UniProtKB/Swiss-Prot annotation:
The lineage of its organism: Bacteria, Pseudomonadati, Campylobacterota, Epsilonproteobacteria, Campylobacterales. One of its GO terms (molecular function) is proton-transporting ATP synthase activity, rotational mechanism. This is ATP synthase subunit b. It is found in: Cell inner membrane. It comes from Wolinella succinogenes (strain ATCC 29543 / DSM 1740 / CCUG 13145 / JCM 31913 / LMG 7466 / NCTC 11488 / FDC 602W). Keywords: ATP synthesis, Cell inner membrane, Cell membrane, CF(0), Hydrogen ion transport, Ion transport, Membrane, Transmembrane, Transmembrane helix, Transport. NCBIfam families: PRK08475.1.
Length: 170
């Protein structure tokens, strides 16, 4: 803001005095006056300008330090996230492996149980068939014996009964 007013103040005397005649130029005196003006200006404003630049430098350094601190924090957060990701990945692999093992075990258990059930059903079927076979044999034997005992016409001995039974059963 001060710069906006400072530059026109420097140029204003030059414009006002530029309308002079074509006389002799006093360039040496003007140069000496300009150097004196710059020296006075430097004497009065140098500390303030230095303070402005130092303050600006310090604010930039502080801002840079904050940015570096945030960068370090974000790197730490990234590393932690990467570690958590790797751990989660490892845990997921463990869960998958465990699930596969459980599937194999459950499949084996179901197969064993099913085989046992099938063997029991086959055994029950065979026992039932054997029982029905014996039942049918007894019924046939009872029928034959009933016929033989009812018919008094034929008097047979034990060997004849045995032969008749064997023929009927076979």
């Amino acid at each position: 803001m001060k710069g906006k007013y400072f530059i026109p103040c420097l140029l204003l005397p030059t414009m006002m005095l530029a309308s002079g005649g074509g006389g002799e130029t006093d360039i040496v005196e003007r140069t000496i006056n300009f150097v004196i003006f710059i020296a006075i200006f430097y004497y009065l404003a140098a500390d303030k300008i230095k303070a402005i630049f130092v303050a600006r430098q310090e604010s930039i350094a502080a801002e840079l330090e904050k940015v570096q601190e945030k960068l370090k924090e974000s790197k730490k957060a990234k590393e932690q996230a990467q570690k958590r990701f790797e751990e989660s990945k490892r845990m997921a692999e463990d869960v998958i492996l465990t699930a596969k093992k459980e599937v194999v075990l459950l499949t084996q258990k179901v197969e064993d149980s099913t085989k046992g059930d099938i063997e029991n059903l086959i055994r029950q079927y065979n026992d039932s068939m054997e029982f029905e076979k014996r039942k049918a044999e007894r019924a046939i034997i009872d029928e034959i014996l009933a016929e033989l005992f009812e018919s008094d016409a034929t008097k047979l001995d034990k060997s004849a009964y045995s032969e008749i039974l064997l023929k009927k059963v076979a």
